[in-house]
Structures are given as structure tokens and as C-alpha cells.
């Protein structure tokens, strides 16, 4: 039997009122953070980035598709990957169904990855997504924003971590293994069909851009736990009696939606 506290209805109502006050405080703080996010200064994008798309090679400004705001998810699918990252895939699942609502608010949302376009197309068909997905292969877009690295860079970093015992553990990557690499990294590397160094050429991220007065501006970027707003199942699980219930297996339970039950 669970050792969870059992209460009367009156005791529950009193505790619920206390929690409600904290929930309202959390909501107000979220509103304030959203306001501050909107007020961040914009940085002009002066480099001419090119992307491979289903309609041929395009410039960054063309990706807005006639809207004034462009939201980009830096999806972890590197050149050596055979499949997309399962955690990133779960985020795409969340966003895919809300595209019409975003378009209604003058927002274009798309995925960008380093892998060749044909790989992205095949994986998109498998997942059944409608999300537009473009390859950054023709340009340094992902590298310049800090979400892609060369395999030489990652192999050197991984070798150094394993040789010295250094770790990349943080609140962003989950519990340490003692080997310098969190379990989620090795787990997802296997899942994407590459090795650790190949997997770490990519980092997850979210960036926003504005098209205003014939110029494009970079407005915002975030990564790691800053991406949880795209993981629609997490706030739902946070309201479940057992919460996320991940323990030390941080995000290792996440599968592609066609792999549960295997």
C-alpha cells in the first residue's frame, strides 16, 4: 500500500487552497517572464543563410512563408544519424497538431536539421508529421547559433571527458554516470543509429526571428530545459498523481510514438 498521506475532505480543501495560491503566483511569474522575453532586443541577421527545402533552396527570409514571425526548432538529426532523436521527435509530435493555430497568429513554425533533406523527408513520412522541415546543410546557420558542431570537435571533447573523468552533467542533461557522459546521451546515440561523437554534433534548441521593414532579426533562443514548453506531455504528467516519475532515468523512457509497446 502507498505511504502517501491520506486526509479528510476538509484537510484536502485547506491544503488545496494553499497550493492554489502558489499556482497563481507561478502563473503571474510566467506572465512576467513572457513580457520580458518579448522585450529582448533584436539582433539583425546579416549573413545570407541558405536552406534545402521541399521547394528548392531558399533564403532565411523566404522561410517566413509570408508571415512576420518565424519559430525554428533545431531538431537533432545530424549527418551521421539514421533516425531523428526520440526526445526531439516527441516535441515535434506536440507541435504538429497546432500549426493552424500558430498560422492564425502570424507565426510560421518549422524544423531545421543538419542532415540531408532526403533523410529528413523519409523520417517525416515515418512520423506522419505535417511540420515543414528544412536542411541547414548549405549554410552555417546551426553552427553560428551554437546548435551544431563538427564531428572532430565532439570526438575530441568525448575523448577528453573519458580520459579525465570530466562530465557534461547538469540540470540540462540529467544524472551523472561517473564516465563523463549522462545515460541519456549514450541511450539516444544508439537510438539514432550513430555513436556518441556523431550524436553530439547536434544540440537541441529553439530560436525565433522577426521579419520587419525588409530585414530579418534574431529575437530569442533557448535550449535544454528551456525547451520543456514544447514537451506537451510534461505539464500533463506534472498534474498526474505520480508526476513525471522518471527517477534517475531522465527522459530515457521517451520513445518515438510508433515504438511504444515494442
Residue ranges of model-derived segments:
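Residues at the C-termini of beta-strands that transition into short coil/loop
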Residues: 113, 135-137
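Catalytic nucleophile loop
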Residues: 103-120
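Non-globular targeting/processing and membrane-anchoring segments
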Residues: 1-70, 75-105, 122-128, 132, ...
Amino acid at each position: 500500500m502507498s505511504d502517501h498521506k491520506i486526509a479528510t475532505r476538509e484537510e484536502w480543501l485547506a491544503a488545496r487552497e494553499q497550493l492554489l495560491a502558489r499556482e497563481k503566483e507561478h502563473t503571474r511569474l510566467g506572465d512576467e517572464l513572457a513580457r520580458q522575453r518579448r522585450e529582448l532586443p533584436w539582433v539583425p541577421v546579416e549573413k545570407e543563410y541558405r536552406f534545402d527545402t521541399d521547394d528548392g533552396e531558399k533564403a532565411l527570409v523566404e522561410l517566413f512563408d509570408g508571415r512576420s514571425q518565424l519559430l525554428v526548432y533545431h531538431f537533432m538529426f545530424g549527418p551521421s544519424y539514421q533516425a531523428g532523436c526520440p526526445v526531439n521527435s516527441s516535441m515535434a509530435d506536440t507541435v504538429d497538431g497546432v500549426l493552424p493555430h500558430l498560422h492564425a497568429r502570424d507565426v510560421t513554425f518549422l524544423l531545421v536539421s543538419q542532415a540531408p533533406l532526403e533523410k529528413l523527408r523519409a523520417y517525416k513520412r515515418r512520423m506522419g508529421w505535417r511540420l515543414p522541415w528544412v536542411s541547414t546543410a548549405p549554410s552555417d546557420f546551426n553552427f553560428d547559433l551554437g546548435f551544431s558542431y563538427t564531428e572532430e570537435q565532439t570526438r575530441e571533447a568525448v575523448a577528453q571527458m573519458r580520459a579525465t573523468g570530466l562530465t557534461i552533467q547538469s540540470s540540462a542533461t540529467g544524472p551523472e554516470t561517473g564516465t563523463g557522459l549522462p545515460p541519456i546521451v549514450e541511450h539516444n546515440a544508439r537510438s539514432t543509429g550513430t555513436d556518441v561523437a556523431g550524436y553530439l554534433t547536434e544540440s537541441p534548441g529553439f530560436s525565433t526571428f522577426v521579419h520587419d521593414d525588409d530585414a530579418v532579426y534574431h529575437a530569442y533562443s533557448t535550449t535544454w530545459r528551456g525547451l520543456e514548453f514544447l514537451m506537451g506531455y510534461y505539464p500533463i504528467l506534472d498534474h498526474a498523481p505520480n508526476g513525471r516519475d522518471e527517477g534517475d532515468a531522465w527522459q530515457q523512457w521517451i520513445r518515438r510514438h510508433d515504438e511504444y509497446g515494442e
